[in-house]
């Protein structure tokens, strides 16, 4: 697991359509990678909203719920729940987690980790820290696009949880999923021409993701 180390122009109408399309692609990537049906804390109520059983909060849609799961309140409750379960059942180890992931991916023969490059920058105007990830997937399966997900330190079972960090995961068959350890700070998810969150999948089979942390 590694620690971390706007382009274009055009008419207003074209820019607006590009902005909408990009937001939809980002939303779809998240929904494809995160199976909320396996989340023990989400329930749908009688008015079509979604509730978090862990934090007793209500959310208008799945996207809002997923954003909530990355927040401080949910992460704090997860940490407390994990500590309680560890005390009550100390025999559960990370080996169980590893076995589970192997079963999930047993139909695909992994070919190793993809190559990658990370660029660390700061916005000259706002002072915000930026991380740019470029992941190469030359042998990605036909018709697929890479997926990404941000995971809290208390969801993973590879390292001892540290509340100061979170993990950015990239996945694409038949490559192994790779994870980067990044600061546990709120990510600026503004989009659009001046947005601070950007993803791109190009014809050279390089997946690019750039994010900024809020100050």
UniProtKB/Swiss-Prot annotation:
Keyword Nucleus in record: yes
- Where do the ZnF regions (Matrin-type) fall? 50-80
GO cellular component terms, semicolon-separated:
catalytic step 2 spliceosome; nucleus; spliceosomal complex; U2 snRNP; U2-type precatalytic spliceosome; U2-type prespliceosome
Q: Which domain of life is it from?
A: Eukaryota
Q: Which GO terms describe its molecular function?
A: nucleic acid binding; zinc ion binding
Q: A GO term (biological process) for this protein?
A: spliceosomal complex assembly
Keywords noted in UniProt: Metal-binding, mRNA processing, mRNA splicing, Nucleus, Spliceosome, Zinc, Zinc-finger
Similarity section:
Belongs to the SF3A2 family.
Q: Tell me the subunit arrangement.
A: Component of splicing factor SF3A which associates with the splicing factor SF3B and a 12S RNA unit to form the mature 17S U2 small nuclear ribonucleoprotein complex (17S U2 snRNP). Identified in the spliceosome 'E' complex, a precursor of the spliceosome 'A' complex. Identified in the spliceosome 'A' and 'B' complexes. Identified in the spliceosome 'C' complex.
Q: What does this protein do?
A: Involved in pre-mRNA splicing as a component of the splicing factor SF3A complex that contributes to the assembly of the 17S U2 snRNP, and the subsequent assembly of the pre-spliceosome 'E' complex and the pre-catalytic spliceosome 'A' complex. Involved in pre-mRNA splicing as a component of pre-catalytic spliceosome 'B' complexes, including the Bact complex.
PANTHER family (alphabetical): SPLICING FACTOR 3A SUBUNIT 2
Please report the name of this protein according to its UniProt entry.
Answer: Splicing factor 3A subunit 2
Query: From which source organism is this entry?
Result: Dictyostelium discoideum
């Amino acid at each position: 697991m590694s620690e971390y180390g706007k382009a274009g122009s055009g008419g207003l109408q074209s820019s607006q359509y590009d902005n909408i399309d990009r937001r939809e692609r980002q939303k779809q990537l998240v929904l494809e990678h995160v199976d909320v049906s396996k989340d023990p804390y989400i329930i749908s109520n009688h008015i079509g909203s979604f509730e978090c059983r862990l934090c007793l909060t209500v959310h208008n849609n799945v996207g809002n719920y997923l954003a909530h799961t990355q927040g401080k309140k949910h992460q704090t409750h997860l940490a407390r729940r994990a500590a309680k379960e560890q005390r009550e059942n100390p025999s559960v180890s990370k080996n169980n987690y590893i076995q589970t992931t192997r079963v999930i991916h047993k139909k695909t023969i992994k070919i190793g980790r993809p190559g990658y490059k990370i660029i660390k920058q700061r916005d000259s105007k706002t002072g915000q820290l930026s991380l740019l990830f470029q992941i190469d997937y030359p042998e990605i399966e036909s018709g697929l696009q890479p997926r990404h997900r941000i995971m809290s330190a208390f969801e993973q079972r590879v390292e001892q949880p540290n509340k100061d960090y979170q993990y950015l995961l990239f996945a694409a068959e038949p490559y192994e999923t790779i994870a980067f350890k990044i600061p546990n700070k709120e990510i600026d998810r503004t989009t659009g021409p001046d947005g601070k969150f950007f993803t791109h999948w190009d014809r050279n089979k390089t997946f690019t993701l750039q994010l900024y942390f809020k100050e």
